[in-house]
Structures are given as structure tokens and as C-alpha cells.
A protein has these predicted regions:
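Bacterial Sec-dependent N-terminal signal peptides
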Residues: 1-21
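Carbohydrate-active catalytic/glycan-binding domains of CAZyme proteins
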Residues: 18-380
Length: 380
């Protein structure tokens, strides 16, 4: 009896990390880190570097969605158990600094540059006290995955440059558009003007106290198989998505970019590639409230992009299970869809919806599951 008790104690000591409960992801539930604290990494993304996953996201306070801490980082070997690695990019107390404490810093994503050996972080930035008027990107770099990241700059995208997918005739037509003729929004004429480049032209140059360049709000990053990287963001007052190529060191734009679904009101882009085809899941623009997910595909990341039906299936699919897309994580030959259930009244209590992506009839499907384990899908 004593021997059996000793064996039982030994099993309890060595096997907890293999328990079914510990290896289960429960979408929408509290997800605790190694300290027993709900993971605070919202609107973020995950990379796999040398066999370790690193999750970066917005640190949310209890009462405000403004950035009071910065971008946090967690690490994991199995996608379930996460270790708090600290603040990868802290906000600063210097008055007037771009990332001053109290700014809006959202949707941080990190990619690794094989040539420079640096980790590059991009995020959506709004200056303190300016609401959502600035619509900037921010970029920072680090020599290690956990940071600290060094802030480089913020700004708007590709000032003075037309999209590469616009013909000369389309550019000439857009150049004739006058915002003064479209003061009333949401009319058929205004919508047509947006599609034709009304806001695109407006933001080509500095105006109304704003710097030149395209607006950049909800965003993600994508590194292609040829190691070229792209910045995908919601622009033109959240009415049109842009896909912009990054320089070889991933810290700036080359000037080459395209528009996706002009006037379609898409945000929260999450992109992945399977069997040579690019897929992008987005959401509509309904503030903090969830809506039906959208999906697009393309044979080239620079388009053209084709829209498909909502990929979500199951209870709550019509509102993306109460969440909003933030990232698609490649894991081996599969993919994990990541979304956030926002709680603006209690931001730090926002929840995560992670679900495996399946393919049916050639189309991605995100099916609701109360719980699932990465192992059952072959994720390692």
C-alpha cells in the first residue's frame, strides 16, 4: 500500500503537463499564465522562433483601453501553457513622445528577419489625447524575441504614392475628385467616389494638420515564402484595406502597395497561405461590437482579391463567436485562427478565441468548439 502511494505521488509530480485539462484550449474562457494570471496580450500575434512560441499583445488596464503599460510577451512550447516574459515594448513617461503613456497602441505583430537577425514589431498607434485621428503605424526592433524592443518611429504610409494596382487612367480620374463635392457621407455618389480614390487622394499629401501618407489602423504582418514581408492595414478611414510591401530589413515601406475591397469597410485583417493561395479573414467595422467575419482569397498577395462567405460555423458564427479576428498562426501544416472578445467596460478581461482552421471543399472553415487540444490536430 505504501509503495502504491509513493508511485501515485511520483505520477502526480511528473505528469501534470500531460493532463488532458492542462493541454486543452477553451475559447472565450479565462486563460491563465504560469503565475495564475489571465494572459494580458490582446489584439496580438504569435511567432515560432527556434521551437518556442512567442505571443505579443496589448496590455489592457482594468478601466481604460489606452496603453498604460505597453506590449507584453509570453512564451510557450505547446500553445497551451504560457510563461510571462514581461513587457517587450514599454510605453514611456516623456511628454509628447509618440508612445507616451496613455497613447493608443493596438494590434502589435512581430516578425523575424533572417538577414539582420532582428525581431521587428509593427503596431497601430494613436497619439495621446488625439483619439483615433492620427491613424499611424509604429515600428520597433529588438535583438531578442522577448525584447526590450527599441521604438524607431511612427508615421503614415507611402506619402505621395499611388497604389501599384491603379492604372494611369484610374489615377488621373482619382486626381480630379474634390472632397468639397462630397460633404455628405454614405450617399451613392460618395460611395462611388471612395471606391475611385476620394480618401486615397486626400491622404496623399498633408492636410488638416495631418502628415502626408495613408492612414494605418487595424493591421497585421505577413512574411512570404521568399522572405518578402508585407504590412496589411485598414486605411482610408477604415473603408479600404491596403497591402504594402516592406523593405528588406522589414522596418520601412518600399512604396509598393495595393488596395483590397475599396469601400468595403474591412478591418482586423488576418492572413495566411495554403497550397499557393493566400487567404485573409477580416471583420466589418462596428467598433467594439462583434460582427460577421469576412474572407478573401488571392493567388498573389498583391491581388486581385476575391471575397468568399463567412468562414465561421457553429453557434455564434454570425458574430464571429463574439470576437474579432486578430491573427492566423501557422502550426506545422495547419493553422490556428485567433480572435479577441473585447470588453471595453473592463478591457483587461477581454477573452481569446483560438480555433483550428479546417478546409472543406477547398475553403477554410473555422468551427466553434467549447474546447480542443492542439495535439488532436497534429499541432506541436
Amino acid at each position: 500500500m505504501k509503495r502504491e502511494f509513493i508511485v501515485l505521488l511520483w505520477l502526480m509530480a511528473v505528469l501534470p503537463c500531460f493532463s488532458v485539462g492542462n493541454m486543452t484550449i477553451r475559447p472565450g474562457q479565462i486563460w491563465k499564465d504560469n503565475r495564475g494570471i489571465h494572459i494580458n496580450a490582446h489584439g496580438g500575434g504569435v511567432i515560432n522562433h527556434n521551437g518556442t512560441y512567442y505571443w505579443y499583445g496589448e496590455h489592457k488596464a482594468d478601466t481604460t483601453s489606452s496603453a498604460m503599460v505597453g506590449v507584453t510577451c509570453y512564451s510557450s512550447k505547446n500553445l497551451v501553457d504560457w510563461v510571462y516574459e514581461g513587457v517587450a515594448l514599454p510605453v514611456v513617461d516623456e511628454e509628447g513622445h509618440d508612445i507616451e503613456r496613455g497613447c493608443i497602441l493596438e494590434r502589435p505583430k512581430v516578425i523575424y528577419n533572417k538577414v539582420t537577425g532582428r525581431f521587428v514589431m509593427w503596431f497601430h498607434l494613436e497619439l495621446k489625447g488625439r483619439g483615433y485621428a492620427e491613424a499611424r503605424y509604429g515600428v520597433a526592433v529588438s535583438d531578442t524575441p522577448v525584447g526590450p524592443f527599441k521604438f524607431l518611429r511612427s508615421g503614415r504610409v507611402n506619402p505621395g504614392l499611388w497604389p501599384s494596382d491603379m492604372s494611369q487612367a484610374s489615377r488621373a480620374a482619382a486626381d480630379t475628385l474634390d472632397a468639397g463635392n462630397y460633404k455628405e457621407w454614405w450617399t451613392p455618389a460618395w460611395r462611388e467616389a471612395i471606391v475611385n480614390g476620394l480618401f486615397l487622394k486626400r491622404d496623399m499629401h498633408a492636410h488638416d494638420g495631418h502628415p502626408a501618407g495613408q492612414m494605418a489602423r487595424d493591421m497585421t504582418l505577413y512574411v512570404d515564402s521568399d522572405d518578402c514581408a508585407y504590412h496589411i492595414y485598414s486605411s482610408e478611414d477604415n473603408l479600404t484595406l491596403h497591402v504594402a510591401e516592406l523593405t528588406a530589413d522589414y522596418t520601412a515601406h518600399t512604396g509598393r502597395y495595393v488596395r483590397v475591397a475599396p469601400g468595403g469597410m474591412n478591418e482586423a485583417p488576418a492572413i495566411f497561405r495554403k497550397d499557393g493561395k493566400y487567404w485573409m479573414i477580416t471583420s466589418g467595422c462596428t467598433g467594439w461590437e462583434p460582427n460577421e467575419a469576412r474572407m478573401f482569397s488571392a493567388d498573389n498577395i498583391l491581388g486581385p482579391w476575391t471575397q468568399h462567405p463567412n468562414p465561421c460555423v457553429g453557434p455564434g458564427a454570425g458574430k464571429t463567436f463574439g470576437g474579432q479576428s486578430t491573427y492566423v498562426l501557422p502550426v506545422g501544416d495547419g493553422f490556428v485562427f485567433m480572435a479577441d472578445i473585447w470588453r471595453p467596460g473592463h478591457p483587461s478581461d477581454a477573452r481569446y478565441v483560438w480555433l483550428p482552421i479546417e478546409f472543406e471543399h477547398g475553403l477554410p472553415v473555422v468551427r466553434w468548439r467549447d474546447e480542443w487540444t492542439p495535439v488532436e490536430y497534429g499541432f506541436k
